[in-house]
Amino acid sequence: MKKRIVSLLLALVMVLSLVPATVWAAENHDGQVRVVVENTTYAKANGAAWDGTLVDKWVDLAPGSSMMDCIVSALGTYSQTGAESGYISEINGLSAGDGGAASGWMGTLNDWFTNVGFKDIKAGDKLFAGDIIRVMYTTNGYGADIGGDWNTQSDTSLAALSFSEGVLTPDFASDKTAYTLTLPQGVTGIRMTATASNKNNQVYLTADGTDYRRVETVPVHNGTVLTIRCGDKAAATEWSPAITPTTYTVTVSQEGDAPQGDLDVSFKGLHSAQLASLKLYDFADGIKGD
């Protein structure tokens, strides 16, 4: 019997050794960021050198590296022009100006058009493992066709809001700001996907007073309050309108659980005879089964 078990184990080891390591590592992206390079606005049929998704891959995030370093790494052998100077003007033969006077390359970090250049966003400062960098070609309004319209920057609403688990009620609408997220028992963490109506405005997430990045799993329990803010308050300038953030709240309701909090047991109002009749137990009594 022992020989038979050993033989089966050896056979299993041999089978597992034939499975490529990438199968097991496919979902493990510790220490990496995802880089997507795409052109969805200028069709090849209309003269573009290429269209669709050119790159979608995870690359290592080295200490001190920048968003630009990650983009160059992801492009690999594809050509690019300008990364060393801080502005990419061409990728794989598709250049700024090819799709019109306002065409060129722009990019987001976690779905937000950054307010500084790609070279200035560094690992450990504003760039972290798990982040998503998306480089996109625009042909209209310097980003209006890919989610960043400078003419509507005062719009700090969300266009969409969803979660990896649970049911959101009421159904999401941009002008509704208070929701309940009902989760099944046993769910202890969720991920949020929030899309700004104007991606020039950054989306922030706070849960029970702790800030979380868009790509992070947020620990939750019954009664957790998620606060989602879109935009940063700013006064009007000669070039831009005043910005007033929009805040959404989502309260977690876990099926079958009461909200967590401190248990407050009070004997106020009992007279002395009632108090004398009470039998109090400590934790050790419960363990002994008294």
Region spans (language model):
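Eukaryote-biased recognition of intrinsically disordered, low-complexity regulatory segments
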Residues: 27-58
